[in-house]
Amino acid sequence: MAGPSNQTQPPPPVLTQPSLSFTQGLLVGQLSVVLLIGAFIKFFIFGEAPPHPSRNGLSNRTSSHRRSYSLNSISADSSPRTLREKPSTSNILRPVPSSSTNTRSILRKTYYSATPTNPTSKHSRSRPHHSSHQPESLDWFNVLIAQTIAQYRQTAYILKDSPTSSILASLSEALNNPEKKPSFIDSIKVTDISLGEEFPIFSNCRVIAVEDPNSDGGRLQALMDVDLSDDNLSLAVETSLLLNYPKPFSAVLPVALAVSVVRFSGTLCISFVPGPGTSDQTMSPSPSPPKEASAENIAVDHQSPERQSARQRAPHQHKYTNTNTAGATAAATADDNDTHAKLPHGIPKTSLAFSFLPDYRLDLSVRSLIGSRSRLQDVPKVAQLVEARVQAWFEERVVEPRVQVVGLPNIWPRMGRTGVRGSQEETEAGAGGSAPADIPGTAGGDGVGVRGGGGGGGGGGGVGGSGGGSMRGTSGWGMGYDGLRYRHNAHGDGGVGAGPGQSAGAALYGGAQGGGGGGGRGGEEQFAIPGSMPDPVVVT
């Protein structure tokens, strides 16, 4: 019989008590969440914002040109103004710092380094030195200038039949000015005009500082090289030399001339002057005859009523949306003229002064034809006289130390000059290739014309008004004219006629007659000047 078991059962496990109670754990968890939220608010919401990307890039690109001030810094001499302070009526506009127009201050703020000039005794002017800044190529500027010149050429051709706004009328009026034309020269008739096909190329632009006693720290001047070559810019005229001794019209000598620009190159100087009065004294331009100014004023005053009437008719005649842009341009031009007329004479107006350095190059080609029965062609002395006169005309106007001063227009935004860009391409495509209705100079536009001219064998220009928006997409070669060359020939008056395949020299000398002239001015027309003419001779 088995005895009782000596085995003892193991003691039950002892339960460990937690070190923290449930309440304490809850408090610790809530506290940690609060700390995390507080840290997030402090470092992500109320923390300092990172610098702007553009400012970052600018600081990286111009690490050597650090600004010594910030937008929030206030200079020591200027007192801060709070919103609660009410300034007086005479102190609403804050004063401009005295160094705002200083040359060194402008160069420092624009990160441009220029070398000041040293005075020389020639013409009592300063000779500019090249700046230490890297010259610029001006490719973008060439594109803008080319578009502007192309627009002027196209507008001049469109307005060729206008009796008052055409370039032919302006040139004829300038060349036949009775106050400048000698008595021994008969009426000058323009027979051929070519506005060219190429565009000037600007390059190597640099900014220099020149000394100017009338401005603080001198003034800044931009120098750029310009070159125009292989262009077809020409003007052909015909007239007669009158021999008035011993009696009037004793003899008449027919003369025909054709002047072409072969190449022009030089250095263009551009600077801004404070106002017309100051610029006249500073730049010392040659005084112009008062008659020219009065004639121009009369021409502008004569055209102003037409501008006003055209502007009144414009809202009813414009058809396309992009016409508003051209109408706004014409209205802005008239508004600027009215604004300038209302400005007091004591208020200076910023002007643009430009000129060329004396080391320019102007190559001309002069063709001449003298006589009626026995004709002399390309007389060297005549070519020398004409070239010397053109060179003198150019130097008297835009060659240092003489400059041309042009007032800058008012560019403050106005509703009168506000326009809306329209889909002109779609409009022209829907018209089936026909001429758009918004071409300047046609019916339904603001027929604003600006006339210009030059004396002493100079030139002039006519710029047609807008009246219809931009001319984008309209090619000049698709309009039936060859290189913007306009050959004037009245009905049966013996002018120079040339066909599309005929050069200006061939038309001038009556040789190599081409066929297929357009508009009644065909290549079969022969050169005719007063007196009998033999058969045409081919020039070799």
UniProtKB/Swiss-Prot annotation:
Record CDD domains: SMP_Mmm1
GO molecular function terms listed in the Swiss-Prot or TrEMBL record: lipid binding
Compositional bias annotation for Low complexity: 321-331
Keyword annotations of the record: Endoplasmic reticulum, Lipid transport, Lipid-binding, Membrane, Transmembrane, Transmembrane helix, Transport
Positions of the SMP-LTD domain: 134-409
Main location (coarse class): endoplasmic reticulum
TM region(s), chain numbering: 26-46
This protein's record includes keyword Transmembrane: yes
GO biological process: mitochondrial genome maintenance; mitochondrion-endoplasmic reticulum membrane tethering; phospholipid transport; protein insertion into mitochondrial outer membrane
Lumenal side: 1-25
Subcellular location(s) of the protein: Endoplasmic reticulum membrane
Complexes and interactors: Homodimer. Component of the ER-mitochondria encounter structure (ERMES) or MDM complex, composed of MMM1, MDM10, MDM12 and MDM34. A MMM1 homodimer associates with one molecule of MDM12 on each side in a pairwise head-to-tail manner, and the SMP-LTD domains of MMM1 and MDM12 generate a continuous hydrophobic tunnel for phospholipid trafficking.
Recorded domain comment: The SMP-LTD domain is a barrel-like domain that can bind various types of glycerophospholipids in its interior and mediate their transfer between two adjacent bilayers.
Protein family according to the UniProt entry: Belongs to the MMM1 family.
Protein name according to UniProt: Maintenance of mitochondrial morphology protein 1
Gene: MMM1
